[in-house]
């Protein structure tokens, strides 16, 4: 009886792991839409209370005009910053200069505001971990 329980339990765990790794197909972007993909913190280490740059990679249908990027920790109000530049090379990204934050790990979420059909729209939200040293 115990071996059957363990077999069923291990099968359930394997199924849970397999389903959590499954990718969800992305819907195609509508004309003028922007979808954030990932972030990259620049530099070899972030020091407490020192500004730092973040690249935000995205995909877009057309040539979007990104107004600003907004960052927040869960439960806090977003702080929005102007986009420094947009790169349209093999990887599409824009860069934002962020002010210094306190020492420790931070789970930061980000979205961007962009112009589509003459209106300001918000992208999807992506999250990243930022570890700030002394």
Predicted region positions:
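Short, compositionally biased P/S/T/A/G/V-rich stretches that sit at domain boundaries
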Residues: 22-52, 57, 62, 133-134
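Short, solvent-exposed loop/turn segments at the edges of extracellular beta-sandwich modules
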Residues: 114-119
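Aromatic sugar-binding surface patches on proteins
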Residues: 86-95
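Surface-exposed, short loops/turns at beta-strand junctions within beta-sandwich domains
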Residues: 98-105
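Short Trp-Ser/Thr-centered turn/loop motifs at beta-strand boundaries
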Residues: 123-125
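Solvent-exposed loop/turn segments flanking beta-strands in beta-repeat/beta-sandwich domains
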Residues: 61-74
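C-terminal motif of bacterial Sec signal peptides marking the signal peptidase cleavage site
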Residues: 17-20
């Amino acid at each position: 009886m115990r071996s059957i329980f363990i077999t069923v339990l291990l099968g359930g765990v394997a199924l849970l792991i397999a389903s959590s790794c499954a990718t969800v197909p992305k819907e195609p972007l509508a004309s003028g839409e922007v979808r954030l993909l990932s972030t990259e913190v620049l530099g070899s280490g972030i020091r407490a209370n020192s500004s730092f740059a973040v690249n935000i990679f995205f995909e877009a249908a057309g040539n979007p005009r990104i107004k600003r990027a907004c960052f927040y920790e869960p439960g806090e109000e977003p702080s929005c910053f102007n986009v420094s530049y947009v790169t349209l090379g093999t990887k599409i990204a824009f860069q934002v200069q962020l002010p210094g934050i306190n020492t420790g790990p931070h789970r930061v979420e980000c979205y961007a505001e962009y112009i589509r059909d003459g209106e300001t729209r918000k992208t999807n939200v992506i999250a990243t971990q930022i570890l700030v040293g002394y």
